[in-house]
């Protein structure tokens, strides 16, 4: 069902914390040289989108900057296996540094997902309640 062990492990944390979520349940169209579609890994009941990454390659980083510029209403956050991993073999910038630079929230999967990310306050977001669609 899940495309990676990291996504599976993230789902286990969400289930353990009794957080309602949908897996790959939304299509966001965006333009990047040509029209593309993004399917988030997890959409939490509170509307937060979790994107789980073992590797965070250049194309993924570009994609998320394009998506955010075209869909600023969505709160996309990263769950990394290792946020301290370097973007490039001999580089200094880490995944965490990149997120800080571009103001994306992130966490380390092994440390669990921050509790404030999981809170719903009894409300379901519009993004969570709608059916999977191709509309952005």
Short names for language-model regions:
Residues 1-136:
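Nucleic-acid endo/exonuclease domains
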């Amino acid at each position: 069902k899940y495309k990676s062990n990291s996504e599976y492990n993230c789902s286990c944390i969400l289930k353990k914390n009794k957080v309602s979520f949908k897996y790959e349940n939304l299509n966001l169209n965006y333009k990047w040289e040509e029209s593309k579609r993004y399917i988030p890994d997890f959409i939490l009941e509170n509307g937060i989108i979790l994107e789980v990454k073992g590797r965070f390659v250049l194309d993924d980083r570009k994609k998320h900057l394009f998506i955010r510029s075209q869909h600023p209403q969505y709160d996309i956050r990263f769950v990394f296996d290792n946020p301290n991993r370097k973007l490039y073999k001999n580089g200094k910038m880490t995944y965490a540094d990149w997120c800080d630079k571009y103001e994306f929230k992130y966490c380390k999967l092994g440390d669990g997902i921050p509790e404030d990310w999981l809170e719903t306050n009894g409300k379901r977001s519009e993004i969570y309640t709608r059916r999977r669609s191709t509309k952005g």
